[in-house]
């Protein structure tokens, strides 16, 4: 059986890197008595894969990993068991049963929602209205949004406008806050800080990455009709009244 788990990450845990988070959840799953399947062979390991690695320093409400299990308790009991093993800064919020033919989350990721805000002690160079006018001028009203994208071996000009699905400016504690939905995944992956940095440059402003807190809200897959669906909605919750399920018994 395939299970998809959703979790939140905040506070000091935002400084824990992806590989350490993988090891953390491997231990947590074992201690929570989740009946996870192991690979075959001499160096057997848990069958677990994460959807989209989160950068160090970024908080999130929408992190995912998939596991294969032999049997499972209900969604409610499984979340409780996992959260009993969590430290402050990590909370499991979802646990759903996937179809037998479901693809791994990491291969499905197509987009993600982010909120970028100014950290305490840092001020925005523009007011909310000035940001809205600048984004309209340089992004929405422009036929393209060409930036220089650097790779390990080279750099090239890229029009990232088609890869930014949503971009708005909001107010939070009387400060501007940016909401973005951007292309994410193995094919076209755009980091939200890259977009904001490019906007700063178009406005002739100096960008300070230390001033910005990035928060990932959700991660999506793309359905056959082109619309987006959050990864958790691709599965079903396991009824709390059901008995412990195994691979030959599905509700």
Regions found by a protein language model. Give the residues of each.
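Hydrophobic, proline/glycine-rich low-complexity stretches
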Residues: 1-7, 13
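N-terminal ordered "arm"
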Residues: 10-38
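Ordered, soluble secondary-structure elements with a strong preference for glycine-centered loop motifs
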Residues: 15-19, 72-77, 125-129, 186-190
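A domain-level signal for the structural core that forms small-molecule/cofactor-binding pockets
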Residues: 21, 94-97, 161-163, 170
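Short, charge-patterned binding micro-sites
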Residues: 37-69
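Ordered, amphipathic secondary-structure segments that act as subunit-interaction surfaces
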Residues: 61-115
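Non-catalytic RNA-recognition surface used by pseudouridine synthases
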Residues: 102-107, 111-211, 215-233, 237
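Single conserved hydrophobic/aromatic residue that forms the stacking wall/gate
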Residues: 241, 245-251
């Amino acid at each position: 059986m395939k299970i998809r788990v959703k979790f939140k990450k905040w506070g000091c845990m935002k400084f824990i890197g992806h590989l350490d988070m993988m090891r953390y959840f491997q231990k947590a799953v074992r201690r929570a008595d989740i009946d996870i399947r192991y690979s075959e062979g001499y160096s057997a390991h848990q069958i677990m894969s994460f959807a989209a690695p989160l950068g160090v320093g970024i908080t999130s409400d929408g992190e995912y990993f998939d596991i294969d299990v032999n049997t499972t308790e209900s969604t409610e009991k499984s979340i409780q068991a996992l959260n009993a093993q969590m430290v402050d800064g990590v909370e499991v919020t979802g646990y759903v049963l996937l179809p037998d033919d479901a693809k791994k989350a990491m291969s499905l990721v197509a987009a993600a929602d982010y909120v970028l805000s100014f950290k305490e002690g840092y001020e925005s160079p523009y007011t909310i209205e000035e940001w809205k006018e600048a984004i309209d001028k340089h992004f929405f009203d422009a036929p393209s949004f060409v930036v220089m994208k650097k790779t390990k071996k080279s750099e090239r000009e890229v029009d990232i406008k088609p890869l930014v699905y949503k971009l708005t400016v909001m107010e939070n504690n009387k400060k501007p806050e940016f909401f973005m939905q951007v292309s994410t995944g193995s094919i076209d992956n755009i980091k939200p800080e890259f977009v904001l940095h490019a906007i700063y440059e178009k406005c002739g402003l100096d960008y300070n990455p230390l001033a910005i807190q990035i928060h990932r809200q959700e991660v999506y897959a793309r359905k056959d009709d082109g619309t987006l669906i959050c990864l958790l909605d691709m599965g079903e919750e396991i009824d709390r009244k059901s008995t412990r399920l195994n691979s030959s018994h599905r509700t």
